[in-house]
Amino acid sequence: MPSIDSGAQSLVSLRDLHLSFGNNCVLKGIDLDVERGQAVSIIGPSGSGKSTILRCITGLLQTQRGSIRVGQTRVDELMREAERIELRKRVGFVFQQYNLFPHLSVLENLVIAPRKVLGIERGEAEKQARALLAKVRMEHKADAYPGQLSGGQQQRVAIARALTTRPELILFDEVTSALDPETVGEVLTVIRELTEEGMTCVLVTHEMRFAEEISDQVYFTENGLIVEHGSAEQIFQRPTSERTAAFLRHALGDSGRRNPTAGDPFLLSNISRYSLSV
């Protein structure tokens, strides 16, 4: 697997990333860093390239220009699918639509990757799967099938499944956007707990208050560009770009709080602690 000898501390590094589909330029020179143990949120309007960035990190999309590094691996130089599979053992990906196998039980959905990908024997794989289900408060649904679960429960199982290969990094792609509002909180609680345990996470999300609460760094994207990035406090309380401020005014304008203006601080107070339902 292609690698680089780098003293950089960042777990993920993107430099000058360009990606086009035909004449449609989707990414236009993306630079992004994720330090080990950080939670990084990518926010911005729909169609701004957020989810595309995540797919580039895992090698699901091939860029035309720029470099992608995960640990010591140069993702943009991986030519064989076997090399990309090795990378994906280290990078968990939780999708918007769960992507659970509908014909397998919850437990079997978690056992299959450790057995097929890591070669772990069934007894140990099942033991690990049950421990991960307990971690997301879904152990009581081990024998259920995805169709018998709520959207929030399915997404919690999907998060547990992403942990089965013991990844260094988990990518979350708008994992609450398809959920009923009443089940969003249970998924956010699990993500919050992972960040508190030191799991490196990159989130594409429209949950602005949650992003501000958990993120070490926030990137605001539009039209395939990083418009602004900085700490959560800086982006949400003191955005320097008027476009970032306008986006946040729109996203948070119905909350009753004073709308942000570039360079003018505001506070997101009383952020709720989401409860976890079963």
Predicted regions and their residues:
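C-terminal boundary and immediately downstream tail of ABC-type ATPase nucleotide-binding domains
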Residues: 222, 233-277
